Amino acid sequence: PDSNVHWKVKPQAETDTDSLQLFRSDYPLKDWVDAIVPGTVFSSYVAAGLEKDPNFGDNIYQVDKTKYDRSYWYRTEFSVPASFTQEKIWLHFQGINRRGEVFLNGHRLGLLDGFMHRGKFDITALINPAGRNVLAVLVQTPQHPMANFASPTYICSGGWDWIPYVPGLNSGITDKVFLSNSGPVTLEDPWIR
């Protein structure tokens, strides 16, 4: 995945039993919304023209927030770059908010749980190096009324009298998603004291 990848988004409740099929490369996406990545679920719906621009008038107050305060699937397909000739292939997430369950080709890679959480997965054994790969992320919004109090630095992101509450609590794939390639050993985040 990189800037050339086309993401789609849809509420989990609307995929119903199809969620078992969405990992197939021939899965129909005609009623899915084009997703903005990096971005939020709500910003994708605004960009698609399904919500009015929240920056004008009282549009933000007219949004049915229950529509966004629920789980959403993000989905894309990608191929491995021909330049990847080293042993290991890594999938990087620079930010998912608030909670994201990551699947590649139907296999669960893991859970990223936190505000703008980052993650890295070794996908070498699961990747289809010669064909299409399906990446799906189930982004979940906290379902309790004090959700933003879990992180004191995040409290002022919305919901006070001076800034309206953002539908979905800014949930989505909020930063870059990309692949990298390495040899069998890597050194990351060295710190010398």
Features from the language model and the residues they span:
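Predominantly extracellular/luminal regions of secreted and cell-surface proteins
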Residues: 9-10, 14, 21-50
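Coil residues (strongly favoring Ser/Thr
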Residues: 3, 17-19, 54, 59
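Short beta-strand segments of immunoglobulin-like
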Residues: 191-193
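Accessory beta-strand-rich segments of carbohydrate-active enzymes
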Residues: 10-14, 48, 69-189
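A short, local hydrophobic-aromatic micro-motif
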Residues: 5, 30-33, 175, 188
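Extracellular carbohydrate-recognition regions
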Residues: 1-11
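Surface-exposed, low-complexity/disordered Ser/Thr/Gly/Pro/Asn-rich loops and linkers
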Residues: 43-66
